[in-house]
Amino acid sequence: LVVDRGGHGRTLRTIADAYKVQALQGVRWTAWKALYAATRGAARALHLEHEIGSFEPGTLADVTVWDWAVGAVATHRDAVARDLHERVFAWMTLGDERNLAATWVAGRELYRRPGV
């Protein structure tokens, strides 16, 4: 699952679309599996898991900070979530580029939404 392509701004849409494809094929894809596919799993598929895809010391990291809920529907869904998995699932399936709060690349902050 490629979600780190610079500049496209549709990370959460990509994850949500992948979830839908999995569901249509009868595969139960949890929020944790989706996060793995977008991070460590993608690095592993490229045979780069020792260099990227995690926060382990010595690895390279581009970091994106997200707001949990932006907009009325997502805010309500976040408020009624029973656990962390439900919060992450709602964020992944209802979120979009408006949820982006800040981005760091190679240790430098490149973007911070006003008010964050």
Which residues does each PLM region occupy?
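His/Asp/Glu-enriched, well-ordered alpha-helical/loop segment
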Residues: 1-75, 93
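C-terminal cap of metal-dependent C-N hydrolases
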Residues: 60-115
